[in-house]
């Protein structure tokens, strides 16, 4: 059913109406509309008086500093024949495959990190500021403390420089000297310790955090508890009891809400949910209030507690939301996204609470982000191949977001397009995939497609769906538009395209696809080569096409030979040997075809009966009884059942000398003896079994 003509399941007016079971009584107040209407134009007094012209001065508009550049950029479209923009600075480093693309991106990032390290290690050599206006990020950063005496100012400086160990040492020295550290400075120290888990941050800490979150996300999608644990402990940052943060927190003479909230958030971040919930109880006993960010962490901690049923966890989350109302804490987008993110762990039980959460967001006027819809998609489509009727919620989501322009509001916003296209591919819904792709190309939404890995996943799924569902001419247009300017195809992508060409009877494109495959680094992909050879050798084709197929087969044959020379690799597959020999025969390249028979013996592969009959036809066409006898010898060497039939054909269709007839007779006798021996062996095996 087309998406644009359907009514939504959870975006219907009767579901969007304010009446959910969550806990915000102020949602009925005005000013919380989901959409903000455009302001009416002011009426100018006297403007309707005949003969009087009134000038309406528009309100001042502040333009962005790069507004002109943005306007110019909007007039230029992507060049489908060029390499991705990120590689155009250095033509030597333009990749030709997905592996090279990933390697070059890592190399570029490594070079940036090396340059930053040199600049920050030797700042005195990089003092000249050539940028106008001044660009702070291009200048060296000073990471060494300048205040050497033991004072609170020195502690504040070390905290600002994110020196974890030095900050703790300075704090201890101040306590030993009898100096009282202010509550504000102590809270700043707790912030530092809780954020980095009592460990010294590395130079690429933010990059590592992002990698860890992606591993946890993939582990959640795979529902693999072991992989979740491994990803969670990947960096070795876990909350340990009696660490420096807990010690300093216990030494504080006075604590405010900020102190408790920092500790709670640090415990949740570093996998200590039970301790965080216990500390929240202490906060309530001291008649303090938590902020919205702490409640977000507590919601996550509630879902992480083990040995509790899903219903108990959901009730605990509802209790936290009620406490937010009691403490006059207004939820934000991350509150609801955290709830939806946790509900993914509840499987089928989480579907109804997820719908309630979405209704509540609309009721209090919080616009969902792309991450919100990503969590809903993951919850309702947890299986790799959902049935068409399992859930229609993806259609409601697309009805809601079509035509909208999104900006990043959540760290997981860049995962929506990947999950949406995965569902489109699973449902085999091409129209829905076009809608998702249209949303991606709306405004600057393309910036939210994510990393290089996510972009390749998205376009691979999209192109796979095109190959299965779209007409071949349209598919080829997409092929030229997307590859390689947007992404580099995997070997499976090329196989999908070959199968689409087969269905559309466009096998004349196969040699070009092989040429492209070599450019994209798939020269030694055996599955791809066997697919190409099978399509070319399966049926007879016009002579011109057979010549092109034979040239392609010769090129593929050279890859097997060069592969054996360059590395230890599997031998020729029997199917590939058969296909190449057939293609050579059909193109009239008889000499090369007969050489292929020697490869069967060399690699100890058995030729097919159909291939041997085609070879016999070729020998008959060239009136060569010697080749026919060699063919019978090959069949006899492998004790093939077709040997007897080949012998009869040679005796009947060729003019043989007496010597050749005797040789054929000997081959026939040897074949019959070997077959009788095998029959007797099988009979003895049967009798022993009885």
Predicted regions and their residues:
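A basic, Ser/Thr-enriched alpha-helical scaffold prevalent
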Residues: 1-690
